[in-house]
Regions:
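Conserved GNAT acetyl-CoA-binding A-motif
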Residues: 81, 109-123, 238-248
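Glycine/small-residue-rich hydrophobic helix-like segments
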Residues: 184-244
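Conserved beta-strand-loop-alpha-helix junction that forms the acyl-donor binding cleft
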Residues: 118-129, 247-257, 273-280
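Conserved donor-binding loop and adjoining core beta-sheet/short helix segment
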Residues: 26-103, 107-109, 121, 200-209
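Conserved acetyl-CoA-binding loop of GNAT-fold acetyltransferases
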Residues: 132-142, 261-270
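Active-site acidic-Proline motif in GNAT/NAT acetyltransferases
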Residues: 89-91, 95, 204, 217-219, ...
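Conserved acetyl-CoA-binding loop-helix of GNAT-fold acetyltransferases
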Residues: 94-107, 134, 216, 222-235, ...
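Short amphipathic alpha-helix that is part of the acyltransferase structural core
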Residues: 1-44, 138-195
Length: 284
């Protein structure tokens, strides 16, 4: 019974919440080998910039005394859409905890301006998918997490052509000039003859690199610039010390998926997105 537990909510997460959520995520991942998309680092970064939506509650918690046993959080990259993801400690499941967390979030959603909920679940999470199925949410799209080992890329033809030297590969892109345009966000812009053809965001945490938001301007697509910018990004991260490199790709984007797999990236996990429109949630 959920009456035995304490439910709270907050505008954003603090350092204490962060630690507790990470511990809860570890327990859940150890239990059923699934991934979550909690965006905790993004949330704390936005809170530090005072850019969090403070008009209402975005983080929902369930405690058994001082122990966090359930969590459901909102991430909003678009003011009209909320992405939500959460979890319940394995030994506390089937007690209605997640249902109560979702009910509280739904009340908040219906009282505020966003028009759509995107519910996220790892495709291997039986409990997550069962919950979403009960809501009759509509499938929206899927997103792969893909990973590349630096050692695999070092066997890549273009890398071998440059003697396994990432610096040489970076310099070889004589027609593609890539410069950092936002040091805080680690954004890089690629140009050809002074014209912007694309951009990418790179991250390095310990020895894990990340490639995000790789985008080629529409009129320059289909000319090999996406592959050139991807290879540049991989070589750049390797030169910075990355041993593995991760990225995310929408499974509906067949061209990008083929590009990444041909470069050596392999699927590590898949996150499924399901949609609920506000008109369908009122009264639930």
């Amino acid at each position: 019974m959920t009456s035995n537990y304490t439910f709270t909510a907050s505008v954003t997460i603090d350092s204490g919440h962060y630690r507790q959520i990470m511990e809860l995520e570890k327990a859940c991942r150890n239990y059923e080998d699934v991934d979550f998309k909690l965006e905790l680092d993004f949330k704390t970064s936005e809170a530090g910039k005072n850019q969090t939506d403070r008009s209402g509650r975005n983080e929902f918690f369930c405690y058994d005394h001082d122990a966090l046993v359930g969590y459901l959080g909102v991430c909003s990259f678009d003011s009209a859409v909320w992405e939500i993801n959460g979890m319940v400690r394995p030994d506390y499941r089937k007690q209605g905890i997640f249902t109560e967390l979702f009910r509280r979030l739904l009340d908040e959603f219906n009282a505020r301006s966003p028009q759509e909920l995107l519910l996220l679940s790892d495709k291997k999470s039986a409990s997550g998918l069962r919950f979403i199925e009960r809501l009759h949410a509509n499938y929206h799209h899927a997103e792969y997490d893909m990973v590349l080992n630096a050692s695999d890329f070092e066997q890549h033809g273009e890398f071998v052509e440059h003697g396994g030297d990432s610096s040489s590969l970076l310099r070889s892109k004589s027609t593609l000039d890539v410069q950092e345009t936002d040091a805080e966000e680690h954004m890089f812009t690629g140009t050809i003859a002074g014209k912007i053809i694309g951009s990418v965001r790179l991250e390095l945490l310990s020895d894990e690199g990340g490639i995000y938001a790789l985008e080629i301007v529409p009129e320059y697509r289909g000319h090999g610039y996406g592959r050139a910018l991807l290879n540049w990004s991989i070589a750049k991260l390797i030169s910075m010390g990355a041993k593995t490199i991760i990225l995310q790709v929408d499974t509906d984007n067949a061209r990008a998926l083929n590009l990444y797999t041909s470069t050596g990236f392999v699927e590590e996990s898949a996150m499924l997105y399901y949609s609920l429109r506000k008109s369908l949630t009122k009264g639930n």
